[in-house]
Amino acid sequence: ENIEWHEVTGQKIYAEGEAFQFLERPGKITPGARITNTRLGSYCSVGWIVEKNGEQFILTAGHCGREGDAFSIEDPEGRHHVVGTMTYSEFQNHGDIGRYDKGLIKIDNPAMVDASLQLFWKNQKMITAAVQNTDWTEEHKPRLCRMGARTGLSCGPYYGVGADGQLIYNAISLPGDSGGPVFATHNGHAFPIGIVSGGLKEDAIHQVAQPIAQFLNDGGYTLL
């Protein structure tokens, strides 16, 4: 898939679903791909691929499962492949907003991993730049984008920091997008910011991202 990226500016909400339908059956572990919890039968989205001590993990939302749950990915032919087991899950919610919502799935077969965003800029795959923290996001107030298996790509203006440190921004998201990557973009570079956690039911374009910089730093994880 060659999904050409166009910079989105202003206060408008951008949404593109059709071009990202391949995320439903990607046959590989890539940001935004659908991952099915084999115990629950429900699905979320791959966030970022991280590494620690030579092992690779999917960083996704904690509410997508519990420790010990297996997750699978479907290929274009409809075959399901178990890709790993959740080794860490924490979810603390406050109404519609998760105070803390992070999970790690240990990847069984690193050969299935394509850690790059499936976006292209001027016919070159978009470069994943350095992870940025909440202070950077507050200073630059960039437009944020999220990818997920349910609704594809959506971008909108950054709104602010929630009471418990979550990042609030405007975009379109539905159940199934949870856990997917959230990033800022500039000139063909994507700056990882967080993962999709949820949204406000009474104000559906307000979305919630869990910041990831401190989690990665504290845990000794490196983004691939």
Residue spans for each PLM region:
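Terminal presequence/propeptide segments associated with secretion/organelle targeting
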Residues: 1-74, 150-152, 163-164, 170-171, ...
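Poly-acidic low-complexity segments
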Residues: 4, 99, 109, 192, ...
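Serine endopeptidase catalytic core focused on the charge-relay Asp
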Residues: 29-163, 184
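Generic structural signal for well-ordered, non-membrane alpha-helical segments
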Residues: 98-100, 175, 205
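Active-site donor-binding loop signature of nucleotide-sugar glycosyltransferases
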Residues: 107, 197-198
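Hydrophobic alpha-helical segments and their boundary regions
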Residues: 130, 168-169
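Catalytic nucleophile loop of clan PA
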Residues: 172-195
